[in-house]
């Protein structure tokens, strides 16, 4: 490996064209030759990537070139900067250029400010304790009336202030409190029942005077909260009623659970019955004189018609068989009503209790009731 030492002032060649502001040397006044600030190194071809004879010019900027009057004229060299020298850059492949570009973009887009909720903050054991401390300082509602002490009660007065304890202690205490109760009461109690039982265990025994007050707010709240459990039907309400105090009154809606098993159907609505249209009366048949005379003659001979006789009479008079049949029935009813005599067979059946077709008529003029 061949090195060319060009650092000595006597052997160094001129560094080439120099651009930039460099103070002119004092060639005439003083015989002063400053030390060169460039080092040129020649590398063999086995270490090169690009051209076979590649020369890398390594610039080592030192302090500005000294001068005899440096101590006096130090302010003149404040604007001194390294002269611009054309450097030979090595050749990179496309993959390397792409990698360098992606790395520069990633460094440019990397956020400098820390994220408030990063993974490190979340995994920290103190994460979330500030929220607990803030919520523990929230004040309850202000007292409004004399029954404030009865209506309002904090969640748990027995628990001390949790802000002075560590995270491990709070976690162990939370697990112990959760293990004290079965999950949801072993699926046999509702949430309201569990809360009622816990409040009953923690509360001191009430005085007799407070128990005698029927209008106390505590009894109202307890009855309302316990009454909210009975929404599954009248059978559940009756079972709860038997388990609780016999003198306790339940709200009326507890017993009104007729449609609880099928809530989608809803209450049944009674349809309004439409008024039936009046039956169209059959138009009265207008018989001619000849037809009436022939019908009266046949009725005088025999009050009852056979089927063959009725058919022949209908064909002779040009009437329907039903018209002739109805005329004979009406004629017999008029005679029976006018005479007032009963058929002896009908009287015998009525005596045996097998026949009773007595009709009650009320006359408009005399308003008397006649039983026929």
UniProtKB/Swiss-Prot annotation:
Keywords: Developmental protein, DNA-binding, Homeobox, Nucleus, Segmentation polarity protein. Residues 280-339 bind DNA. Residues 79-105, 197-215 have a biased composition (Basic and acidic residues). One of its GO terms (biological process) is neuron differentiation. Residues 216-244 have a biased composition (Low complexity). Expressed in the middle silk gland but not in the posterior silk gland during the fourth molt/fifth intermolt period. CDD domains: homeodomain (cd00086). GO terms for molecular function: DNA-binding transcription factor activity, RNA polymerase II-specific; RNA polymerase II cis-regulatory region sequence-specific DNA binding. Pfam families: Engrail_1_C_sig, Homeodomain. It is found in: Nucleus. Residues 1-35, 47-112, 196-246, 261-286 are annotated as: Disordered. Belongs to the engrailed homeobox family. This is Segmentation polarity homeobox protein engrailed.
